[in-house]
Amino acid sequence: MWIVKGILSSVVLKGHYSLFSRPPPSSLPDYALRFLHFTCCRSSKIMFSEFDSSNASISPELRQENAKALDSCYTEEQRAVILQRLNTATESELEQVKLLRGRKSVNIVKYRTRHGPFSSLESVINVPLLKYKSAIMVFDSILNPDNKRKRNKGKVHLAKFIKPDVNRAHLEDASSIISIVCGTNKIAWAHMDRARTVLDWQQAECQSFMKGTYLASDYLEDISSVISSFPAADFFLVEKPSISPQNTSLFPVMVHLRTVEAMLFALLSQAREPGSPPKVLNMMRISVGRHFDLMVGDCRTSGAETLRKMMTDSVMKRDPRVLFPHDLVLKHRNSFQMSSRNKGEEMCDALLQAVAFFELLQE
């Protein structure tokens, strides 16, 4: 059944009268015929009684109006600034623009290489993952790079990615953090500084996890052993899992993760003076997934491919997104292949969480 937008002013008769045929004057009043607009097949070519919907007089007008929509939102000078940035910036420079981190910056560079420089703002939405609304935000960010930072100075909104609430200035002053991710049988952590240089990166097996009756003393012994190797850092960032309590099949896993999370907070938190920020923070797992475009619906996919690219860029590029020491690249270069996914998934997530923390603070 066709979904018809608008009202057909003519009367459709059964028999030999077609949809666009005028009935005899004696039978019905003289109504003006109007074109049908089909919302589900606007770009397709459909014929009705010698009427070509793809070449109708209204379609080119609509296409022309849409083609001018983005470009007409900006002055000639603003369009020149935006196109200059998009046509000349490197991948790492594009990642500094809001919404262009990860795959979007890669797609822009690939599109330029294949099709040449962008000739109009409208052509930008041909890039995969960039649609009308996101393109507007990208353009505004290029024209006003400091606006958002000035507006959001103060506290980071709880709903975004950090809990508990912390003054943004304290987070921005952090010289290094330790990102911690817990799995069903191991704990992984990454030590990273403000320049996104990986200082250390490890994981440890925990023999008591998900065993028997979840004996608290065994959990405490394993977790204490892991954190005893942590270096000094300004903040400890613990991943907040996104398992729903309604998913009863994963209830044992959720209890395990919450138990480890509570012990990490207790063991890593120190007595602090009134007004000083907490040192142990939660970071939403979903926020990290959205930052790296790893979400499929409500589920987060593996970030192994993203991490492998970061490690490669650290060796090949002069200004990489993340700087890995040479010994860590050699040590972990084969840890994130498909055949060893379960071996290094927690390490992968810990590293990505640290990168997302510093990059989100720059927005």
Swiss-Prot record:
Listed GO CC annotations: mitochondrial matrix; mitochondrial nucleoid; ribonucleoprotein complex
UniProt entry keywords in alphabetical sequence: Mitochondrion, Mitochondrion nucleoid, Transcription, Transcription regulation, Transit peptide
GO-annotated biological processes: mitochondrial transcription; positive regulation of mitochondrial transcription; transcription elongation by mitochondrial RNA polymerase
Organism per entry: Danio rerio
First and last residues of the transit peptide: 1-23
Entry's localization field: Mitochondrion matrix; Mitochondrion matrix, Mitochondrion nucleoid
Membership in a protein family: Belongs to the TEFM family.
This protein's name: Transcription elongation factor, mitochondrial
Pfam family, one: HHH_3
Gene3D superfamilies reported in the protein's UniProt record: Ribonuclease H-like superfamily/Ribonuclease H
Disruption phenotype: Morphants show reduced movement and have abnormal neuromuscular junction morphology compared to wild-type animals.
